[in-house]
From Swiss-Prot:
Residues 926-1213 form the CNH domain. Its cofactor is Mg(2+). This is Mitogen-activated protein kinase kinase kinase kinase 4. One of its GO terms (cellular component) is cytoplasm. The gene is MAP4K4. It comes from Homo sapiens. Residues 317-338, 772-787 have a biased composition (Acidic residues). The modification Phosphothreonine is found at residue 828.
């Protein structure tokens, strides 16, 4: 142990007797900070010679430390490798203020080693430069160590260079002398990254000690700093580095380019056990230090480099230097002048030193003369000797007392250490018991949680099995009903054919009777030809007529009865169903199946309450437990009847007043009353003239089934009542064409149920078009040319005016796509539009179509489909526009007029700014767009081959910033002036400076161009994903690597970079997606997704556990997003994977009995600020509520395409589409600031 009491010789230093610096030195500017004061560049007034002046306030508390520093500098600064101490002055202050002490030292104008490394290309010095500087450092340390002084703060900033490339050690503010008897210290002082393990151990263990060899560890770290630009662990937080240095193996040089001598020197300096570390003299004999043949050339190179650096830096970037004195104290030792500096001084320096020595000598002579004069006057020689003997006796007595006191103190400290060790052992025992108790509680809790989770899983499986069983029973009942109806149909068909055969036989029988009667009449005529009197030409006698009643009575009708009856049946049937194919079949004696209309040629037959009450049912609310985007609005592109429209096109070319299908069964969830001028859809069945309203039947875009008619007897309402199921079944049942279609029909019936089951629905009914022809049909239109025919007045009225069941109209929010060509209004119906209506309070409804070349179809709001009728009628969710009787050429439009906008808003009830819009930029990128981030209003775009800036504020120009580097992910942090990226072939985490990127565009700052524009975060490679999380004023960066997760935190000035915070390695499941949540503002948890599910890591304890594992999926999954739900204190999450999403909390418990179900497998899922989530699929873009998972909106694609989410801000969402061939374009969607609340 060292003696911590001040040295007695320091009492002799009288600060008040020092001279005032006024007129001798003047301060020029501040150049740095020392341990106890600021360092100025000063100038000698008379000679102009520069000096370093350390200015300190003299307080009572720090007076002893200042004396120690003066003593240390005075005694040990006279060496060529230590900054020379010139003298001290006192600047008096007014009463009430502390005096200022000026310490004048040698000025080193070339700066520190740290400045030299920073101003060198690549931030690394040559190996022979490092050897020369290390040797000079060791020589200075050897001088200090000989005098038992430990510097304790060796680092690059405390090693300065003169203009002649000489190396000087400075800052004795933390140095101390060793006790000569013990030789070790145990105080915790130094800079973290350069600190030796034994010095760090003193902070944790009071019994730990160290000696002068701790300076040699710091010398080795300084050598690494010169070789690599920074000390090891510099990316870590300082407290983290203090934790790792004693536990990690000794650091080594990373690069293999250095010589074996250099590696050996580093190994010698960095020995963790300081007792085995070589001494200073041994390291000076090391080959790396000893063998320096070209020392003169090295000094010349260093001097030239220093001169070049000073010219570049100029006056504005002066180097900061740190000078200070010692902190510790020691007993008095004989004062030594020390060896004078052996360096060649700059002219003027020797004069300055002689002036100081002369001033000090004069002061000393004057004080000695006064003392001699006083001693001669007051005391005699005998009294002096007596006084000296008394002093010696007292001193001896005092020494004995100090020894006894020290012995007692050491004994007391030993007892205290024993008591402390006992307490620590007891505390460790209690902690182990507490730890075991907590582990037991945790084990029990986990067992209880596992048991509860297993029970919940078992109950869930049972519920699913019960639900599936009920579904199968329901489907079985549906199938039985359909089979029963099929048997009834077949029975009716057989009965019809039997009756036709009876009629045919009756007609043949009547024909034979007629022939017999004709033969009989011929015979009578033959008899009448004979000559008779006039009265003999009367009719035959009555008894003869009565003998043949069956031949004579029906004579006027016998020949015409079958044809007349067929005409009556045809007329009666034409009045009810507007079609007559079956009536024509009566004359041929067989049943014909009418042609099946295509989607663009037919409307469904809406029936009113007055005619067919069996078809009416209350509208059911559409609130599925598992939400999907399937709705009746979305038509099937793969409909088996799609192709039949061209085969039956002849039926569409006939006159609409005479040839329409007899009865159409439409497969939709609800039936709509089709209004017309003066007639309804119900009256078209009951009282209207045949063919009077050919546009009065609505087509939904779903597949149709056509029922064959067998005979003309019976009203249409009776046939409908037999065909439709009971009202309490809550769904329509449709007649199939043939028994082979029963399976498909049962599947279709399940698809249109109002309440969907909570399990996954496998068939997705969305398509690229909502109505009309496909892209292939568009090509047919181009080939046929402009052969168009206009529809009749009824067609125009049906397509341009819509009257709902309660006489009110609807305004529908639409999606508008702005492309290279702006939209133009047109009043003709488009072949690709689908009109969505709902009840509102507007006055009228008109139809307006726009032309566009976009790849998107109108925006669809599913809440428009959930309409409850206000009266006794039913309301449809879909109204298509086409006409049964219209020729196909009349429906097909110009292929350039492909309408993608349906706007039913005649009264302008909503401004255009509230309408969801999609725009795209004309710029096509040659390589695939992988990521993007908003920088101000402009967009930084990262692709497979580089980084570019898309100027959104100007003409849309693209500026290339970085070429030939892949950018996978990026985020702009403008407040920190950085762009965080995962980039390069090795997927490193790089941070680019925004000022450097801005200068690559503007080229207005040549200083910025010379600096390196980016840096890496640690040595991380193979980054998969990262997330920047802001909590209060702390910015965390959580990074997913191939098999680990790293957490970094932003360290402000002077570090100004991300520094390591936590690391979790060797994870069981490899992370693919990562996020960080703060539970209740206290606990940090890392949430990450893998191919097996979602997991959490407690940052404090490092424990890893599962949050949600989708066990119903056997293969690996693809996690899409981790959404931390708002207003839950970071406790509840929505995790999206595959085509599903579940609500869980951070402890793995299901919070909502709802499964978010996408309509198809999304390629990208993102959370947007409007508290919604968006999914990009190949067929559509879906917008869903984050809180409930319900579908809020759908944007359909005209053709399948792959989309990728980029970024979002406020009401704008940016995404990219990738075309075949590699080109990619940027889209942005403007949702409208208020539209999200009013959809």
């Amino acid at each position: 142990m060292a003696n911590d009491s001040p040295a007695k010789s320091l009492v002799d230093i009288d600060l008040s007797s020092l001279r005032d610096p006024a007129g001798i030195f003047e301060l020029v500017e501040v150049v740095g900070n020392g341990t106890y004061g600021q360092v100025y560049k000063g100038r000698h007034v008379k000679t102009g010679q520069l000096a370093a002046i350390k200015v300190m306030d003299v307080t009572e508390d720090e007076e002893e430390e200042i004396k120690l520093e003066i003593n240390m500098l005075k005694k040990y600064s006279h060496h060529r490798n230590i900054a020379t101490y010139y003298g001290a002055f006192i600047k008096k202050s007014p009463p009430g203020h502390d005096d200022q002490l000026w310490l004048v030292m040698e000025f080193c104008g070339a700066g520190s080693i740290t400045d030299l490394v920073k101003n060198t290309k690549g931030n690394t010095l040559k190996e022979d430069w490092i050897a020369y500087i290390s040797r000079e450092i060791l020589r200075g340390l050897a001088h200090l160590h000989i005098h038992h002084v430990i510097h304790r703060d060796i680092k690059g900033q405390n090693v300065l260079l003169t203009e002649n490339a000489e190396v000087k050690l400075v800052d004795f503010g933390v140095s101390a002398q060793l006790d000569r008897t013990v030789g070790r210290r145990n105080t915790f002082i130094g800079t973290p990254y350069w600190m030796a393990p034994e010095v760090i151990a003193c902070d944790e263990n009071p019994d730990a000690t160290y000696d002068y060899r701790s300076d040699l560890w710091s010398c080795g770290i300084t050598a690494i700093e010169m070789a690599e630009g920074a000390p090891p662990l510099c990316d870590m937080h300082p407290m983290r580095a203090l934790f790792l240095i004693p536990r990690n193996p000794p650091p080594r040089l990373k690069s293999k380019k250095w010589s074996k001598k250099f590696f050996s020197f580093i190994e010698g300096c960095l020995v963790k056990n300081y007792m085995q570390r070589p001494s200073t003299e041994q390291l000076l004999k090391h080959p790396f230090i000893r063998d320096q043949p070209n020392e003169r050339q090295v000094r010349i190179q260093l001097k030239d480099h220093i001169d070049r650096t000073r010219k570049k830096r100029g006056e504005k970037d002066e180097t900061e230097y740190e000078y200070s004195g010692s902190e510790e104290e020691e007993e008095e030792v004989p004062e030594q002048e020390g060896e004078p500096s052996s360096i060649v001084n700059v002219p003027g320096e020797s004069t300055l030193r002689r002036d100081f020595l002369r001033l000090q000598q004069e002061n000393k002579e004057r004080s000695e003369a006064l003392r001699r004069q006083q001693l001669l006057q007051e005391q005699q020689l005998r009294e002096q000797e007596e006084y000296k003997r008394q002093l010696l006796a007292e001193r001896q007595k005092r020494i004995e007392q100090q020894k006894e006191q020290r012995r007692r103190l050491e004994e007391q400290q030993r007892r205290e250490r024993e008591a402390r060790r006992q307490q620590e052992r007891e505390q460790r025992r209690r902690e182990q018991e507490e730890k075991r108790r907590l582990e037991e509680l945790e084990r029990r809790r986990k067992e209880e949680e596992e048991r509860r989770r297993a029970e919940e899983e078992k109950r869930r499986v049972e519920r699913e099995q019960e639900y599936i069983r009920r579904q199968l029973e329901e489907e079985q009942r549906h199938l039985e009903v359909l089979q029963q109806q099929l048997l009834q149909e077949q029975a009716m068909l057989l009965e019809c054919r039997w009756r036709e055969m009876e009629e045919h036989r009756q007609a043949e029988r009547l024909q034979r009777q007629l022939q017999q009667e004709q033969a009989y009449l011929l015979s009578l005529q033959h008899d009448h030809r004979r000559p008779h009197p006039q009265h003999s030409q009367q009719p035959p006698p009555p008894q003869q007529e009565r003998s043949k009643p069956s031949f004579h009575a029906p004579e006027p009708k016998a020949h015409y009865e079958p044809a007349d009856r067929a005409r009556e049946v045809e007329d009666r049937f034409r009045k009810t169903n507007h079609s007559s194919p079956e009536a024509q079949s009566k004359q041929t004696g067989r049943v014909l199946e009418p042609p099946v209309p295509s989607r663009s040629e037919s409307f469904s037959n809406g029936n009113s309450e007055s005619v067919h009450p069996a078809l009416q049912r209350p509208a059911e609310p559409q609130v599925p437990v598992r939400t999907t985007s399937r709705s009746p609005v979305l038509s099937r592109r793969d409909s088996p009847l799609q192709g039949s429209g061209q085969q039956n096109s002849q039926a569409g070319q006939r006159n609409s007043t005479s040839i329409e299908p007899r009865l159409l069964w439409e497969r939709v969830e609800k039936l709509v009353p089709r209004p017309g001028s003066g007639s309804s859809s119900g009256s078209s069945n009951s009282g209207s003239q045949p063919g009077s309203h050919p546009g009065s039947q609505s087509g939904s875009g779903e597949r149709f089934r056509v029922r064959s008619s067998s005979k003309s007897e019976g009203s249409p309402s009776q046939r409908l009542e037999n065909a439709v199921k009971k009202p309490e079944d809550k769904k329509e049942v449709f007649r199939p064409l043939k028994p082979a279609d029963l399976t498909a029909l049962a599947k279709e019936l399940r698809a249109v149920e109002d309440v969907r089951p909570p399990h996954k629905v496998t068939d997705y009914s969305s398509s690229s078009e909502e109505s009309g022809t496909t892209d292939e049909e568009d090509d047919d239109v181009e080939q046929e040319g402009a052969d168009e025919s206009t529809s009749g007045p009824e067609d125009t009225r049906a397509a341009s005016s819509l009257n709902l069941s309660n006489g009110e109209t609807e305004s529908v929010k639409t999606m508008i796509v702005h492309d290279d060509v702006e939209s133009e209004p047109a009043m003709t119906p488009s072949k690709e539009g689908t009109l969505i209506v709902r009840q509102t309070q507007s006055a009228s409804s008109t139809l307006q179509k726009h032309k566009s070349s976009s790849s998107f179809t109108p925006f669809i709001d599913p809440r428009l489909l959930q309409i409850s009728p206000s009266s006794g009628t039913t309301v449809t969710s879909v109204v298509g526009f086409s006409c049964d009787g219209m020729r196909p050429e009349a429906i097909r439009q110009d292929p350039t007029r492909k309408g993608s906008v349906v706007n039913v808003n005649p009264t302008n009830t909503r401004p255009q700014s509230d309408t969801p819009e999609i725009r795209k930029y004309k710029k096509r990128f040659n390589s695939e767009i992988l990521c993007a981030a908003l920088w101000g209003v402009n967009l930084l775009v990262g692709t497979e081959s580089g980084l570019m800036l898309l100027d959104r504020s100007g003409q849309g120009k693209v500026y290339p910033l970085i070429n030939r580097r892949r950018f996978q992910q990026m985020d702009v942090l403008e407040g920190l002036n950085v762009l965080v990226t995962i980039s390069g072939k090795k997927d490193k985490l790089r941070v680019y400076y925004l000022s450097w990127l801005r200068n690559k565009i503007l080229h207005n700052d040549p200083e910025v161009e010379k600096k390196q524009g980016w840096t890496t975060v640690g040595d991380l490679e193979g980054c998969v994903h990262y997330k920047v999380v802001k909590y209060e004023r702390i910015k965390f960066l959580v990074i997913a690597l191939k098999s680990s997760v790293e957490v970094y935190a932003w360290a402000p000035k002077p570090y100004h970079k991300f520094m390591a915070f936590k690391s979790f390695g060797e994870l069981v499941h490899k992370p693919l997606l990562v996020d960080l949540t703060v539970e209740e503002g206290q606990r940090l948890k890392v949430i990450y997704g893998s191919c097996a599910g979602f997991h959490a890591v407690d940052v404090d304890s490092g424990s890893v556990y599962d949050i949600y594992l989708p066990t119903h999926i056997q293969c690996s999954i693809k996690p899409h997003a981790i959404i931390i739900l708002p207003n839950t204190d970071g406790m509840e999450l929505l995790v999206c994977y595959e085509d599903e999403g579940v609500y869980v909390n951070t402890y793995g418990r299901i919070t909502k009995d709802v499964v978010l179900q996408w309509g198809e497998m999304p390629t990208s899922v993102a959370y947007i600020r409007s508290n919604q989530t968006m999914g990009w699929g190949e067929k559509a873009i879906e917008i869903r509520s984050v809180e409930t998972g319900h579908l809020d909106g759908v944007f359909m694609h005209k053709r399948a395409q792959r989309l990728k989410f980029l970024c979002e801000r406020n009401d704008k969402v940016f995404f990219a589409s990738v075309r075949s061939g590699g080109s990619s374009q940027v889209y942005f969607m403007t949702l409208g600031r208020t539209s999200l609340l009013s959809w």
